Curated annotation (Swiss-Prot):
Disulfide bonds: none annotated. The keyword Lyase applies. Fe cation binds at H196, E281. Its main location: cytoplasm. GO terms for biological process: heme biosynthetic process. It comes from the Bacteria. Catalyzes the ferrous insertion into protoporphyrin IX. This is Ferrochelatase. Keywords: Cytoplasm, Heme biosynthesis, Iron, Lyase, Metal-binding, Porphyrin biosynthesis. Its EC number is 4.98.1.1.
C-alpha cells in the first residue's frame, strides 16, 4: 500500500509571550509579505517592524491567555484527519507545516522524508487562495523541493483552494445556524462575515483570486444556511486586520460594524469566514475589539460563530479533499501557486529592482519610502516616531 504524507499548511503563532517578537520578525522577513529592492534591508526592516509592534501584540496575546492555540488545534486536526483517512483504508500520515513559527515547513519535509512516504498531498488550511497565505506556503515548499533529490522524486498533489467544497460549506452553515437559532428573532438575525483582508493591489494588479473566492464562498454558505433554516437572513461581508496606510479590500470590518450599529441591528451573528481555527484574530480581534466596537455602536446582541477546529463534518470534508486528490492527477507546486495574470513571482531567494507592478504588489514604493523616512529620522533626530516616543 502506498504511504501518503498529508502536509497541512498554516500560518503558525507564538505559543508564549516571549515568542511574539521572533514570530513577528519571521512574518515580516518573508519577501512575499514585504519586498525590498535591496536584500540586505529585509531583516533590518523586519526587526524594526517587529520591535515596534511586539508590545501591542504581546498585550493582545496576554488577553487570550498568553499565547496562540493555533498549533495545538492544528495538530489535533492533523491527528483526526489521519485517523479518518486510515479508517478509509488510506495509509496516511499527517504533518503540520507552519509558515512563521514551529513546527516550520522544513521540519514537516524532513519528517515525511524520514518516514519514507511514497507520495505527498499538500492541503492548505486556508479555504481561499491568496498570495500571502497559501501562495507563500506553496512557494516555501517549492524552495525546499528544489535541489532536494529525495523530495523532488516524491509525487505531489497540491490542493489549491477548497472554498466551494460541499463539506466545508455545509459545516460552516451548520455552525452559523446554531447561533442564528439563539437569536430573539432568527429570521432577522444579521449574519456578518468577517474575512481577513489583503491589500487591494494584490487583487487588481497581481490577479489574486482571494476576493472572488471569498464572495463566492459567502453566497454558497448563505444558500446552504437558507436551506437549513427555511428562510433567508440578511448578511454582510467585510474585511478585517488591515495594517498600514495602503488601501485594503473593503468594506472594512470596523466601518461595517459601525453602520450596522447605527441601523439599530438587534442580533448580529459574526462569522470568521477565512479562519478554520481559533487564534488571535478570532479570540482577541473579533471577540474583544470588534465586540466592544459593535456594542458601542448600538448592536444589542453580538454572537460569534465558533471556528471549525475539529468539528466532525469539517474533518470529514478535509478527508474527502485528500481522497479526491489522490484519485486525480498530480498537481505541482508551480501549478498551485500560479496566478491568472502575467505578474512574475520571483523565487524567495532572488530579488528585483524597479518600480513595476510586481514590486508594487509585494509592497513597492511604500516600503522603500517608509524605510528611507525611518533612516532620515534616525539621522535628523526629528519625526513622528520621536513624537510618539518610539525613538
Amino acid at each position: 500500500m502506498s504511504r501518503v504524507g498529508v502536509v497541512l499548511l498554516n500560518l503558525g503563532g507564538p505559543e508564549r509571550i516571549q515568542d511574539v517578537g521572533p514570530f513577528l520578525f519571521n512574518l515580516f522577513a518573508d519577501p512575499e509579505i514585504i519586498r525590498l529592492p535591496i536584500p540586505a534591508l529585509q531583516k533590518p526592516l523586519a526587526w524594526l517592524i517587529s520591535t515596534l509592534r511586539s508590545g501591542k501584540s504581546q498585550e493582545a496575546y496576554r488577553s487570550i491567555g498568553g499565547g496562540s492555540p493555533l498549533r495545538r488545534i492544528t495538530e489535533q486536526q492533523a491527528r483526526e484527519l489521519q485517523s479518518l483517512l486510515r479508517q478509509r483504508g488510506i495509509d496516511a500520515t499527517s504533518y503540520v507545516a507552519m509558515r512563521y513559527w514551529h513546527p516550520f515547513t522544513e521540519s514537516a519535509v524532513a519528517d515525511l522524508k524520514a518516514d519514507g512516504m511514497d507520495q505527498v498531498v499538500v492541503l492548505p488550511l486556508y479555504p481561499h487562495f491568496s498570495i500571502s497565505t497559501s501562495g507563500s506556503s506553496f512557494r516555501e515548499l517549492q524552495r525546499l523541493r528544489q535541489g532536494d533529490e529525495s523530495f523532488e522524486k516524491l509525487p505531489i498533489r497540491c490542493i489549491r483552494s477548497w472554498f466551494d467544497h460541499p463539506g466545508y460549506v455545509r459545516a460552516m452553515a451548520e455552525l452559523i445556524a446554531e447561533e442564528v437559532r439563539q437569536s430573539d428573532d432568527p429570521t432577522q438575525a444579521h449574519v456578518f462575515f468577517s474575512a481577513h483582508g489583503v491589500p487591494k493591489s494584490y487583487v487588481e494588479e497581481a490577479g489574486d483570486p482571494y476576493q472572488k473566492e471569498i464572495e463566492s464562498c459567502t453566497d454558497l454558505i448563505m444558500k446552504e444556511l437558507g436551506q437549513l433554516m427555511g428562510h433567508d437572513n440578511p448578511f454582510t461581508l467585510a474585511y478585517q486586520s488591515r495594517v498600514g496606510p495602503v488601501e485594503w479590500l473593503k468594506p472594512y470590518t470596523e466601518e461595517a460594524l459601525e453602520e450596522l450599529g447605527k441601523a439599530k441591528t438587534n442580533d448580529l451573528v459574526v462569522v470568521p469566514i477565512s479562519f478554520v481555527s481559533e487564534h488571535i484574530e478570532t479570540l482577541e480581534e473579533i471577540d474583544i475589539e470588534y465586540r466592544e466596537l459593535a456594542t458601542e455602536a448600538g448592536v444589542v446582541n453580538f454572537r460569534r460563530v465558533r471556528a471549525l477546529d475539529t468539528y466532525p463534518p469539517f474533518i470529514e470534508g478535509l478527508a474527502d479533499l485528500v481522497t479526491t486528490s489522490l484519485e486525480g492527477p498530480e498537481v505541482s507546486l508551480d501549478a498551485a501557486a500560479e496566478l491568472p495574470t502575467k505578474v512574475k513571482l520571483y523565487p524567495q531567494e532572488k530579488w528585483e529592482w524597479g518600480w513595476n507592478n510586481s514590486s508594487e504588489v509585494w509592497n513597492g514604493r511604500l516600503a522603500m519610502l517608509g524605510f528611507s523616512g525611518f533612516l532620515l529620522e534616525l539621522i535628523s533626530g526629528h519625526g513622528p516616531l520621536h513624537a510618539l516616543g518610539l525613538l
